[in-house]
From Swiss-Prot:
Keyword match Protein biosynthesis: no
Protein name: Uncharacterized protein MJ1333.1
Membrane-crossing residue ranges in chain numbering: 4-26, 35-57, 62-84, 89-111, 116-135
Domain of life: Archaea
Residue stretches making up the EamA domain: 13-135
Membrane topology: Multi-pass membrane protein
Recorded GO CC terms: plasma membrane
Coiled-coil annotated residue ranges, if any: none
Organism the protein comes from: Methanocaldococcus jannaschii (strain ATCC 43067 / DSM 2661 / JAL-1 / JCM 10045 / NBRC 100440) (Methanococcus jannaschii)
SUPFAM superfamilies found in the cross-reference section: Multidrug resistance efflux transporter EmrE (SSF103481)
Matching Gene3D superfamilies: 1.10.3730.20
Length: 137
């Protein structure tokens, strides 16, 4: 099996289990969950920086993209935790899962990536599933 596929599945497992525990915390205080996630992230970043000292990129364009990405991901995680506080994980999480379809669309438009027919069908089925989950509320 392709390494990227294995890593993608691991991401899904880690996000899935992590979001389950986040839902439990968010029922008490979504800001606390967000703060803990960011503190743990900073600690992990420091560990990585100590190990890989030449990881810093000084190219302005790449740095700008990295900052934009970080701001959007941080805001997205805060909104996810607040949504978990306000609603059911069974509704919020599938709705938030449309994010990868947005990434795919942007990658096709701007990075000129292409999809095979099975990939297109898979994305359409995911979107249909998300719609069905959201209207069943």
């Amino acid at each position: 099996m392709d390494t990227a596929i294995i890593l993608g599945l691991l991401v899904a497992v880690f996000y899935g289990v992590g979001t389950f525990f986040a839902k439990i915390v968010c029922e008490k205080n979504p800001l606390f969950q967000w703060i803990v996630v960011n503190i743990v992230g900073i600690i992990l970043c420091l560990i990585i920086l100590l190990k890989y000292k030449n990881i810093i990129i000084t190219d302005q364009k790449i740095l700008t993209y990295a900052i934009i990405s970080a701001v959007l991901v941080v805001i997205g995680s805060l909104l996810l935790y607040y949504a978990l506080y306000k609603g059911k994980a069974s509704i919020v999480v599938p709705l938030s899962s449309i994010g990868p379809a947005i990434t795919v669309a942007l990658s096709i438009l701007f990075l000129k990536e292409t999809l095979t027919l099975p990939q297109m069908i898979g994305i359409v089925l995911i979107i249909i599933g998300i719609i069905l989950l959201s209207i069943s509320n």
